[in-house]
Amino acid sequence: MCIRDRFHYCPGCNHGIIHRLVAEVIDEMKLDGKVIGVAPVGCSVFAYDYFNCDMYEAAHGRAPAVATGIKRSVGKDTLVFTYQGDGDLASIGTAEIVHAAHRGEKITTIFVNNAIYGMTGGQMAPTTLIGQKATTCPAGRSEEWSGLPIKMCEMLAAVPSSYYIERVAVNNTANIAKAKKAIAKAFRLQMEGKGFTMIEVLSTCPTNWGLSPVEAMNWLEQNMIPYYPLGVYKDKEAK
C-alpha cells in the first residue's frame, strides 16, 4: 500500500514512520482497492505520492468534511481516512473535526501533532507548548497571550458521538508498535460501522524545532508526552 519511493520529508521527520504504519495496517487488513484517503494542506499534502490508493486533496482544514461526503457516498465497505497535522486539524480545521465527531461520522482521522507549523516555516501552532519557541513567538509561547496548548483527544473524547480516541507516539520501537495497534483498531471499528475514530500521533519536527533527529526524539519524550499523555481517551467498545 505504501509506494516505495523517497519521501520528501525532512531528515528525522516522523511522517515516514506514520505513513508506513498506516500502509501496513491496510495491507494486513486486506483492504486493497477498498481505501480512500484525504490529505489537506500541510507537510503531508503530497501523501497521494506515497499511498497506493485513491487519495483526495482537501482545502486547508476541510478533510473531515470531504471525508464525510466520500464515506456517505461509497458506504460501509470502503475505509475512509484523513491524515492531518496539528496546524490543519487543531486550527483552521477545528469546526470540521468537531462537527464530524459530533455527527458520529464513520471515518478515521490520523492526527499528527508535532506542536508547530511545519510546512510554513515554524510558526506557533495551537499545540505549541508553553515556553516553546517558534518564529511567531521567539521568546516562547506565553499562556497570557496565547492561552494553553489545545488537547484534541481530551476535547473529542467528551463528544457523545465519538467512538474511539487514542493518543500514541512514534519515538521508540515500543511506542511505534502501540501506534500501529491503535491505528488497526480504529480502522477495524470503522469497517464494523461503529462511528468516529481518531488516533493522535505525537511526532517530531527537527527542522523547525532547531534540533537534531535524536535531540528531537528526546525533546518529545521529555516535553510533549508529559503535557499530552499517551493512552486511550475513549473506547465505547470496551464498555
Please place each PLM-identified region on the residue numbering:
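Conserved small/polar residues in nucleotide/adenosyl-binding loops
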Residues: 1-5
